[in-house]
From Swiss-Prot:
Cited Pfam families: LSM
Gene expressing this chain: SMD1
Domain comment in the entry: C-terminal extension may function as a nuclear localization signal (NLS).
Region Disordered, annotated ranges: 118-146
InterPro entries given in the database record: LSm4/Sm_D1/D3, LSM_dom_sf, Sm, Sm_dom_euk/arc
Gene3D superfamilies for the chain: 2.30.30.100
UniProt GO MF annotations: mRNA binding; RNA binding
UniProt keyword Nucleus present: yes
Protein name as catalogued: Small nuclear ribonucleoprotein Sm D1
Short motif Nuclear localization signal, span: 128-144
Amino acid sequence: MKLVNFLKKLRNEQVTIELKNGTTVWGTLQSVSPQMNAILTDVKLTLPQPRLNKLNSNGIAMASLYLTGGQQPTASDNIASLQYINIRGNTIRQIILPDSLNLDSLLVDQKQLNSLRRSGQIANDPSKKRRRDFGAPANKRPRRGL
């Protein structure tokens, strides 16, 4: 299963996204595009701490936050609340999933599962008995006693 298809199944989950510039975004994941662009709502945006060796690199992030209509964060905590954010896929460093997420059910690929059901390798309904043995060829009919 591709990573993007897995992320598409995480709709309405609370995730934390860390960006390549050090910004941390926490919010509810609404959708993920094939290019891994993520749309989040009810967002808390934490800007990275300014470094002394760079000239006001945090100012650019603050200016873009101001232009989008977000609330101006205080200088001490660098946290802003936004209603909506669209994150470009190539700026994402990592996506942190919640601990309560059931990964086993999300990692099942329905297309692959349906193709295995059609080929007869797995049963459609777990309550039904299998009609043929594993060792017998699939194209032969079962023998009936005379």
